[in-house]
């Protein structure tokens, strides 16, 4: 499934992608570590609403994901993906 970039926050180094097919959203982040590894997770319906209606609270969620992406809270929600340029990712 392919997701198109709909939002970028350069200060926090994350993007939100959306599937035109399903409406599902993905949070993507480039980590500020050696070689800038990339991680992504699917957003729940509540998190998607937070992104749309309460951007300040969503920013806190994104920052927490970036800082704690290996924690049990997020590790089971992470997805494997391939980047297709800067505007598209494909979940594999």
Tell where the protein language model's regions lie, with residue ranges.
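Extended, alpha-helix-rich binding/interface surfaces that flank or overlap catalytic cores
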Residues: 1-92
